[in-house]
Amino acid sequence: RTLIIILFLWADTKLFSSEHSVNYSFTQLSIEQGLSQATVQSILLDHKGTLWIGTQNGLNSYTQEGIKTYLHHSDDPHSLPSNYINHLTEDSLGNLWIATPKGLALYDAEQDRFNTTISQAIYSSIKVKGGIWFGSENTIYCYDYHSKKTKIIHIKKQEKKKNINMVDYRIQKMVYLDKNKILVGTRRKGIYSYNCQTQQFSLFIPSSPNLLTSLYITLDQHIYTSFYGSGLYCYDQTGKIQEHYTQTNSGLNNNYILDITEHNGKLWLSTDGSGINQFAPHTQQFSQLQHIVGDYSSLPVNSITLLYKDQEKNLWAGSVRGGIFCIKETYIKTYKDAVLNNPNGLSEKSIISLYEEKNGKVWIGTDGGGINLYDPSTDKFTHFPSTYGDKVISIAEISESELMVSLYTKGIFLFNKKTQQYRPFTIIDKETNYKECFYGYLPLANQVANNKIYIISRNAYAYNTHNHTFSKMQTDRHYDFSNNALCLSYSN
């Protein structure tokens, strides 16, 4: 009987990632792409699709046309009040507000300029019915859309005999507890509840010795807070503490949490130096996304200042020195080259050949980096320095201990997995081997059965790995080679 076999020189490869594992891709914008500064304080995607990025040195707008930077100019009253951007928000009317330590600016899109409306430092905001509120130091500025006027609310009233440290009452966060109550988080004086009907403040969560860094209410109405260096707190709707997660009593890898958001059923926690923690409340389990040196698919940086989910449900992260990046789920993970013997990448990023063992491990032939071994169970690579410099154009398994590899311009060798050394392999005899390996052809080894390897070069042979015999195969010369394929006719 006649068996027709097509051997493609380039074939589809199986993904290394396991079927159910989720990886993440990161699209980064930083100084190299035109950002004015790499420390990001605030991110906003407006209703027109423009991405606004507030840094410690300027405001940036990002569109399909590129990045445009806005700065403070002392001789221009319509420039930004300050280059240090604390906060960005868009109100219900589509107006863009920019909060800085030296005032609040409203962006005039038609004139492409700014009008400063409040000269005091602004740190936070919240949309309310008929307007928008801005948090300052012990003060909330309440802007009304209809009247275009602003009224002021104070958390604590100044007493004649007692001075208030206004900085301690800096309003870091404002979120809705319910339709009539707003939680107002201060820098050092705790979290207050503001009743919109009675217009009264009451202390909701007592103060902490450390600075408030984040305040977030989940869809199931749990309240989460973070104080710098104190881990993660969870409260119920009455302000009663439910849980306190730290490095010592949970899987949290860093107590310095800078921001909190909810995404795809998990809490995402940005940390100061340890990447992003993902927390699953239903299992009480933490997992991490971190930057790993040499792993180009890992988180770009480990110090994350903020997390922002836009109206398209894209998740963005701002960082201390790496600009911003968009985080998206993907079932494809990209592996690039790393320094020799770094297990997080390849010895050479150009891959010529692949062979998967029964145990799932993948042998990789590179273009000049020799042989690599990938273990999916650990997601790590092993480099073999003894093969470094070799261009490995095909790999097949000749036994449990040896691989048959074809090396560009060198011929076919057997590679011992334990000793990590080559030994020569001869196709039939020295004369035949020379013609097949050094007459301008590249011998390719392809395993088609447990005991059978096809060796394709000037001619084609079936090699039996058990009795070490060769059978010459007939080539179908009428086959169309336009698809880079070799067609063989072989009779058993």
Question: Positions of the model-derived regions?
Answer:
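Carboxylate-rich, polar loop motifs that coordinate divalent cations or form catalytic acidic clusters
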Residues: R1-N492
